[in-house]
Amino acid sequence: MKENKIIVAGIGPGSPEDITPAVVNALKESDVVIGYKYYFQFITSWLSEQTECIDTGMKREKARAELAFEYAEQGKTVCVISSGDAGIYGMAPLIYEMKRERGSEVEILVLPGISAFQKAASLLGAPIGHDFCIISLSDLMTSWEIIEKRITAAATADFVTAVYNPK
């Protein structure tokens, strides 16, 4: 029997081979899959004909999260897909924030995925075998002043640094 839950799944860095078995199982069990339209090309082989797919454009994260709660609160199992890992610049933080704001009883399950920085590191050798950091250059949710401080701190500490969202 299906239950009202949201599965937030990281689908990896852009290749079906990088999607974890746990995410594949979640896709198969979901009534509804919600995500950025580009991501569906990587997952369609695991979806049944009955699965409702809702694709949205970029910068529609809040709308995707709201839709997920609307469907889950109707008793559906909903899978919200993110590229890479859903907890690293993905949908998981927003889903948890919205759960708190709504006072929702919907169960949340986060399934990690392989991040772009992990995939890139594997192709380069082993540059993140010790301490490292990840910094996003996106100023949509963080001021540029804070981003600059983080860049300076990472450089001062001599961290290997993965940079997301360069403009």
Residue positions per predicted region:
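Class I S-adenosyl-L-methionine
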Residues: M1-I108, K119
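Beta-strand/loop-alpha-helix module characteristic of Rossmann-like adenine-cofactor folds
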Residues: K2-V8, S115-K167
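Structural signal for conserved beta-strand scaffold positions within catalytic alpha/beta enzyme cores
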Residues: G35, I54-D55, V110, C133-S136, ...
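Active-site nucleophile and cofactor-binding loops and adjacent substrate-binding regions
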Residues: L109-S115
